[in-house]
Amino acid sequence: MAVLLRKVWGSVLARAAAGAAPPEAFAAAASPRRPQAAGEYGSLGALDVLPIDVLAQILRLLGPADAARSTAVCRAWRLLASDNGLWAFFLRLGPDPWELVVFAETHLGAGPALHPGLYYDSSPQLSFKHVYTRRAVVPGSIIVDGGSGYCKYGWSKYAAPSGRCATFLEFGNIESPMYARLRHFLSTIYTRMQVKPSTQPIIVVLPLCHSDDTESARASRKQYRDTLYSVLFDMNVPAVCSVDQAVLALYAAKRTSGIVVNIGFNATSIVPIFQGRVMHEIGVETVGQGALKLTGFLKELMQQRNITFESLYTVRTIKEKLCYVAADYEAEKRKDTQASCEVDGEGWFTLSEERFKTAEILFQPQIGGVRAMGLHKAVSLCMDHCYNSEVFGDDNWYKTVVLSGGSSCLPGLSERLEKELRELLPAHISEGIRVIPPPFGTDSAWFGAKMISNVSTFTEAWCIKKKQFRQKTRRNGPSFVNVW
């Protein structure tokens, strides 16, 4: 059928080239369709007798390239091929989920400074033909999500990160803005991906560090960005985009405002974000335990039962396969929770109470000998600060909590946190609270960056070019890059 339609379409193009659609036919195309006499054709030629829905289906089968070319045939074809629904259909056939495309183009197309509304119904109508055309020529980008524990990197056009590495083992603390360390880290990524830095833009996921609203913390954040941009432009990268990790995790959940709870490698951060901006002035709460502490605590529990293992990586794998968060810790202790998993090269491991006791230190840190605030208390404190802040807009913006980080993928965490918050907070704050699990698992921030990299206005709205960087550095000094 598709081959036959292409032959028919070829004849339409040939007629157009031969002048088969005179100017008077254009006016006919715009008027209501009338029955055609035998042998009489309108502006669509022999296809004029077909219903509109059949013609639309023909354009769908022909594909976006031929649909775009059809606009040059005559006014009737131009009207058909410009239909928003047709180009929405083509976008749905693309690699990115449709709802993510709509969210990105609606809320992120203007760049990091402008986010028009939180929900689709308050957004301007998109021209999907324009969006499709622009997205088709957006260059592929390198995405680097380098946290203090682990790094993910890959191409923006790929479905998932193509490489991972243990940042803390290979490169040390990359959150410290040292030129040599960052250059070594980024050079290694480019080498492993076998690409030249000068050939494509890069998106760097900024780590959650120096999050206080103090003068020294602001200076540290500026210094980190300064150093990062200097390293990349010295490597001749054509364009750079850098976005906070928590903001990207929020974007991955199709939100521009909310609270992100990131269980990082060494610490857990509770980050309030309003319209794509981290609200440092409200306060980023930090709990001094993260994924490493959970893994270390499971290691202690396994050693107490004389369970042998080769390395901390083994314990981490067991944690990811067997551990979960209990809805009710005391009730869970009365259940039979024994389960087993296999670790490649080391055989089978069986856990019981350790499965839920490991993650319980998020809510009861004293169980693991940690003097810290429970996760639910830290989040409730952040929500209380948001409630009392002078932020104009949606009064409920902080009631959406998005989890991120590898350990936030533990089953039961979102349900337990939501339950604890409802019990801890007063009704006027807790009403409407929703805790969302990591939308893309351990890679949520990476996928948030991927969403930005494919938006139709990416290079203009989100990137800074080398020439801009050099000019503004000379004019304003090195700290100007905090505006990107």
UniProtKB/Swiss-Prot annotation:
The keyword Nucleus applies. Gene3D superfamilies: 1.20.1280.50, 3.30.420.40, Actin, Chain A, domain 4. Keywords: ATP-binding, Cytoplasm, Nucleotide-binding, Nucleus. One of its GO terms (molecular function) is ATP binding. The keyword ATP-binding applies. GO terms for cellular component: actin cytoskeleton; cytoplasm; nucleolus. It is found in: Nucleus, Nucleolus; Cytoplasm. Its main location: nucleus. Residues 44-90 form the F-box domain. ATP binds at residues 262-265. Belongs to the actin family. Plant ARP8 subfamily. PANTHER family: ACTIN. This is Actin-related protein 8.
